[in-house]
Amino acid sequence: MSVGLKTRLLFASAVAALIAVACVGGGGGDGDGEDTSEDRLTFDDLGLDDRIPLYTESWNTDWTKRTISLSELIAGIQRPDPRDVIPPIDDPQFDTVEEAAQWLVDREPVVALELEGEARAYPLRILTSHEVVNDVVGDRSVVVSYCPLCNSAVTFDRELDGQVLRFGVSGLLRNSDLVMWDRQTESLWQQITGEAIVGELAGTELEFIPSPIIAWEDFRAQFPDGKVLSRDQGIFPPELYDNQPYAGYDSSTQPFLFRGTTDDRYPAMERVVAVRIDGAGKAYPFSVISEERAVNDEVAGTPILVVFGADDTASVLDTGDVKTGRGVGVGLAFERTVGGRVLTFDALGEDRFVDRETETVWDLFGNAMEGPLAGEELTPVVNTNELWFAWAAFNADAPVYTGSSTTSTVGY
């Protein structure tokens, strides 16, 4: 059985959604549902696959407004209306750290969000079956999203011009990446970029909020009073989340539901730290930074530090049980300016780093542990640990770090 078919069958059993590929043709359409004018553009006029109107005929999406060719979209779920067949979480329930420790294992990955004085963890074992969580943290309305096919965990502010949007899973994909939809305008949004690509809000971009993937044991140590997305959401039985639907996916050589040519500079399924600052981006392949451990660089004029560690952090895309997923590590990125001074970092043993200017020792999460700057924290920059093919598909012209940093490893 191929990895793709295995993935499809497992996912069907997990979320009752049979994946079926349907490529769409190019052009725009009129989504008002009326058929009173001979001049009205129909799906047939636009050359779209005849299955697409079946899937979307009840939508109020304005197909005439778009920033992409509709030929780039794939219908991923075979239902008359595929929206939210993969159910988003709209009223998230949380466990305490102590409660979550009863069912999470130390090395499994979580999305870590620290905002408005609160810290929350969203285990990937849950996000693989929901992909979208509409949440409120402090006074901020956010959407925490995860696309398993791209391993992209991205959090956005979902308030736009005074209106709070509520997001769901459209059932469509582009470059294998989740396409979200909002229920207020029925616009379609690219998960990996936060841009509305079709509909009333086409061209609008959501604000990124840093939310790295880290190991559960590290979240627990950093935020003992944090909250953890519960297994008991009233949607699926809690034990369902023990079985992961994407077993073997990131060991394959090609992405699933990807229509195009992958960039062969790196293996398609290699993870990269994807840094985004002020509209600029740069990728740092795990195969490179896992050797250097600390990279001093600059993106969009901002001096940054990219670090690699927690090597045993499990992949949620490797086996059916995240407890046995192979270790892939995590990559994180921070601004490296503290108190107006740009620091230069070297790796110092496992998950520790030292700056040359003050010889302060820092941990993997940007906390100064020992030395003159003890107690200081580095400011995170927006970064994800997505798969190379996805980064390259959306950022073909962006630079890629290839090594030869000024960093050295001290005692590593």
Predicted segment positions?
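C-terminal motif of bacterial Sec signal peptides marking the signal peptidase cleavage site
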Residues: I19-A22
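Short, conserved catalytic or interaction motifs in soluble domains
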Residues: G25
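Mid-to-C-terminal functional-domain signal that highlights helix-capping/loop sites
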Residues: G28-Y412
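Bacterial N-terminal signal peptides that target proteins for export
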Residues: S2-F11
